[in-house]
Amino acid sequence: MQKHWWHKATVYQIYPKSFMDTNGDGIGDLKGITSKLDYLQKLGVMAIWLSPVYDSPMDDNGYDIANYEAITDIFGNMADMDNLLTQAKMRGIKIIMDLVVNHTSDEHAWFIEAREHPDSSERDYYIWCDQPNDLESIFGGSAWQYDDKSDQYYLHFFSKKQPDLNWENANLRQKIYDMMNFWIDKGIGGFRMDVIDMIGKIPAQHIVSNGPKLHAYLKEMNAASFGQHDLLTVGETWGATPEIAKQYSNPVNHELSMVFQFEHIGLQHKPEAPKWDYVKELNVPALKTIFNKWQTELELGQGWNSLFWNNHDLPRVLSIWGNTGKYREKSAKALAILLHLMRGTPYIYQGEEIGMTNYPFKDLNELDDIESLNYAKEAFTNGKSMETIMDSIRMIGRDNARTPMQWDASQNAGFSTADKTWLPVNPNYKDINVQAALKNSNSIFYTYQQLIQLRKENDWLVDADFELLPTADKVFAYLRKVREERYLIVVNVSDQEEVLEIDVDKQETLISNTNESAALANHKLQPWDAFCIKIN
């Protein structure tokens, strides 16, 4: 298998609105990100995935783009973006842009032209019909919006301000590739592709994702843009299986570097139920089965996976699956060790490395997220109590991940000097912040730093086979094996003591949040014990 820089990299996701504010308006900005590059260099990450900073009316926090080649005012300007790229490069950090090409904003010049002039070439950049079918928007309600100017309906799988693009149109596709090359020429390190599995949709046949032309489009995109460069490309593919992931990420197919698959995230809610019907208790045996499947069926050389617990759309993993009380630090380290020592490229979401948690939202006034607000409205209309609705939002709503980054114990956690930040700062910021983490040599931060360094220095993390070991339900243990080397990873994913029924001869400890020698000797794992050892 040809090795690429991203096989040994760890990527850090930044949600710009919430990372660092330098102009006191309560909203993060590009200068704020640049000001924190030394911190990210200390952590050791090789790339930043930057959530959208393009010109946008911010209906969906930047995932509604009005101009792909301009920066939205609240984040700064193109000079700030160029400076971020330059300063990041000086520190050995690449910038991965968020590519949102399933849809644009309804304020994009293409859509304005399409609406004003039904006979224009831009009209065919979007999807129109006379009689809508029953397709539904992911944000609730119909996926079709009536446009009185032309007496037709346009398709929007997200908000009505996010009309879907028509990838059947070759001129549109070329314009997208030209835009990608604009950013590649600026020196970016790659693209994270938002809901990329939806670009091959056929609405008339109710085909939303994994449409028949999807992979042809990606091959064309690869050849026309990033294929000539050593860039990281990752597709957001909610419905992917290992077989589908191979189509995207097998190097011989010339599509993407890797995928984000979400099968493990599905354990956050009841099977076949909407995400709001959350399950607080992690089904560890099911998690083992899912990770085992992805580690063994997406074979080395035939595809590549991403490893993540958190992103801007998901609740904080500590709040849903970890422990936010007595074992907060220990469970955060355990979940990190469990994930980062598998095969794949790990992604850290801002604040994960210091153990940030969900926000205790009291009412809808504290929310910004369009998805949560739409859910609340729909659920309340359908007879759910506001208490039940808020309970779901507190556990699973997208704003949990989007509260401001907690830098120190000063006003607004050091994020902003504004009287009011765009989302409230989590009240636990005086205890959970970067400054405190850096001062404590035993903090979660240094476990992440160690895991990132291990990946850079050890080929076995890329090459070694994966073998899930039979253990008690709440114990997740696996071997990584390559040539004569054996590495044992053990994690107690629970608040209880567990029995470890493995006899091994330890050679050395690579990383631990516990006294692993004691655990191996008496076969007892304390709550949230986690370690990786080299064995004979």
From Swiss-Prot:
Enzyme class: hydrolase
Site positions for Transition state stabilizer: 313
Family annotation (SMART domains): Aamy
Cellular localization per UniProt: Cytoplasm
UniProt cross-references to InterPro entries, sorted A to Z: Glyco_hydro_13_cat_dom (IPR006047), Glyco_hydro_b (IPR013780), Glycoside_hydrolase_SF (IPR017853), O16G_dom_2 (IPR045857)
Molecular function in Gene Ontology: alpha-amylase activity; glucan 1,6-alpha-glucosidase activity
Gene Ontology terms: biological process: oligosaccharide catabolic process
Alphabetical list of Pfam families matching this protein: Alpha-amylase
EC number: 3.2.1.70
Transmembrane segments: none
Function: The physiological substrates may be short isomaltosaccharides.
Family (UniProt): Belongs to the glycosyl hydrolase 13 family.
Protein name: Glucan 1,6-alpha-glucosidase
Organism of provenance: Streptococcus mutans serotype c (strain ATCC 700610 / UA159)
